[in-house]
A protein has these predicted regions:
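Loop-helix junctions at membrane interfaces
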Residues: 1-179
């Protein structure tokens, strides 16, 4: 029971970081906010596991919408799917056994960023906007711009930050808990 409560509390901390980060970075635009969100998603899956990462990934788009920085409600399930792809690909790739953990993390960065981009591009740009939403052409183009290559950039930046920060977190964690 203690382990489950601890896992839940630590996941809640990541959700709180996500909410605070989204609110604080909202005025800086999608590149900063999206990169920060992806960083938090990756750190949560790497430090607390897949269940924590998935929980944070699913909460993220809803919180963004409630804060007024997210897109239309109809896009939320697709954003959840994109975040899920990022978290699960990162989780699965980092399970690969290798003598060089940095190579594995870079492979995770590349595959997870590409997976999120592909999921969002086909889910939102190619399916949701043209089939389910009746948007004026200018608004449809704006949505397409937000959910195309920009997502690849923000996922890559968040992943790169995680690649650099994770070793520091691991070192601090080992030092803090071995004394």
């Amino acid at each position: 029971m203690k382990r489950g409560a601890s896992q839940l509390a630590q996941t809640a901390v990541f959700i709180a970081l996500l909410i605070g980060g989204q609110a604080a970075a909202a005025s800086f635009g999608q590149l900063v906010t999206g990169s920060l969100v992806n960083f938090i998603l990756i750190i949560s899956v790497m430090t607390r596991g897949a269940a924590s990462g998935i929980a944070v990934a699913c909460v993220s788009p809803v919180v963004a919408r409630l804060l007024g920085i997210g897109p239309l409600w109809a896009l939320i399930p697709f954003m959840m799917a994109g975040n899920f792809a990022l978290v699960m690909l990162w989780h699965l790739v980092t399970k690969i056994k290798s003598a060089n953990v940095h190579i594995v993390r870079i492979a995770a960065l590349l595959s997870a960023a590409a997976g999120k981009f592909i999921t969002l591009y086909f889910g939102i740009v190619r399916l949701c906007v043209p089939v389910f939403l009746n948007l004026p052409e200018s608004q449809a183009a704006a949505v397409a711009g937000i959910f195309s290559v920009t997502q690849l950039f923000t996922a890559s930046i968040g992943g790169a930050l995680a690649v650099f920060v994770l070793p520091v977190m691991e070192k601090v964690s080992k030092t803090a808990f071995t004394k």
